[in-house]
Amino acid sequence: MASTALSSAIVSTSFLRRQQTPISLRSLPFANTQSLFGLKSSTARGGRVTAMATYKVKFITPEGEQEVECEEDVYVLDAAEEAGLDLPYSCRAGSCSSCAGKVVSGSIDQSDQSFLDDEQMSEGYVLTCVAYPTSDVVIETHKEEAIM
């Protein structure tokens, strides 16, 4: 009687390198996917990527007109400074009038400010240091004397 032994072969794949394929925007090799696609990544929301609105903000200054792009969650003064504009400001908290401007067209959210009264806001005055764009907007700058 002949007996045969069956042997089983064990193959280990632990030595093989696993290549990952990009599965999220963060894993793409671009330096700044936010500016590339107009997206914002937030780790506070579990790493989700959300679309952010970007608006054109035109500043009418004593030196002329200049236009910058501003995301909906960025103060217009900050966007102006990032673009190299030199606009007046002092407190950066919406509690003085150094950065005052006047909205010519468009709309802004300045709910963070505590200086302007309802009448001044209804006339279009804005504190650029605490104003978010909610549409494309045109703002005349250097209006501190007009509200005093």
Curated annotation (Swiss-Prot):
Keyword Kinase tagged: no
CDD domains: fer2
UniProt keyword annotations, A-Z: 2Fe-2S, Chloroplast, Electron transport, Iron, Iron-sulfur, Metal-binding, Plastid, Transit peptide, Transport
Cofactor annotation remark: Binds 1 [2Fe-2S] cluster.
Gene Ontology MF terms: 2 iron, 2 sulfur cluster binding; electron transfer activity; metal ion binding
Tissue: Expressed in leaves. Not detected in roots.
Keyword flag Glycoprotein: no
Binding-site positions, [2Fe-2S] cluster: C91, C96, C99, C129
Transit peptide: 1-52
Cofactor annotation: [2Fe-2S] cluster
Source domain of life: Eukaryota
Coarse class of the protein's main subcellular location: plastid
Gene Ontology cellular component list: chloroplast; chloroplast stroma
GO BP, sorted A to Z: electron transport chain
Family: Belongs to the 2Fe2S plant-type ferredoxin family.
Described function: Ferredoxins are iron-sulfur proteins that transfer electrons in a wide variety of metabolic reactions.
Protein name: Ferredoxin-1, chloroplastic
Provenance organism: Arabidopsis thaliana (Mouse-ear cress)
Organism taxonomic ancestry: Eukaryota, Viridiplantae, Streptophyta, Embryophyta, Tracheophyta
